[in-house]
């Protein structure tokens, strides 16, 4: 992997997600410990119909999922035969709202990786304005069956 701008493999060739639940358009930077992805939220996104019709706002859960998908992209390049599961979200903060037509970056600094678990600290930005941030925990599970997550309560 390179610390320089791409081109990188397409998002759809790495992630199993598909529209309408794919929230990153492309990866623009990638290194051993960092990934930056971009998404432009279009006016016809289905969630804008109900969130909120008079003043459409991208739901916070969509922003967190975008961070998780960026981290999953990074993890799947290291573990291509695994299924990456989001198993934890900590310190989620929402600083501003965004609406249709907004381009955001999802930047995740990938940290500690042990026992199939990956911890990442992510930030969503529009231009230079911080929108949201969170610490994420992902797990590289076997692709079939019911995963047992280390430290989980299943």
Language-model features: where?
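HotDog/MaoC-like acyl-thioester-processing domains
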Residues: 2-3, 32-36, 98-102, 109-154
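Hydrophobic beta-strand-centered segment that forms part of the acyl-chain substrate-binding groove
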Residues: 3, 70-105, 131, 139-141
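Catalytic strand-loop segment that frames the active site of acyl-thioester-processing enzymes
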Residues: 18-58
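Hydrophobic core residues within well-ordered beta-strands of beta-rich domains
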Residues: 21-23, 104, 118
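Compact, glycine-rich, soluble single-domain proteins
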Residues: 49-73, 86
């Amino acid at each position: 992997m390179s610390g320089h701008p791409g081109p990188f493999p397409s998002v759809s060739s790495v992630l199993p997600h598909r529209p309408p639940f794919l929230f990153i358009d492309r990866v623009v930077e990638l290194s051993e410990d960092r990934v930056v992805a971009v998404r432009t939220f279009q006016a016809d996104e289905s969630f804008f119909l109900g969130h909120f019709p008079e003043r459409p706002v991208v739901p916070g859960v969509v922003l967190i999922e975008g961070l998780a998908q960026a981290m999953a992209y990074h993890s799947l390049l290291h573990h291509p035969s695994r299924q990456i599961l989001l198993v934890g979200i900590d310190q989620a903060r929402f600083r501003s709202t965004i609406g249709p037509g907004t381009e955001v970056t999802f930047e995740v600094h990938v940290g500690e990786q042990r026992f199939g678990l990956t911890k990442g600290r992510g930030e969503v930005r529009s231009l230079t304005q911080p929108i949201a941030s969170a610490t994420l925990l992902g797990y590289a599970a076997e692709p079939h069956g019911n995963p047992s997550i280390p430290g989980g309560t299943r």
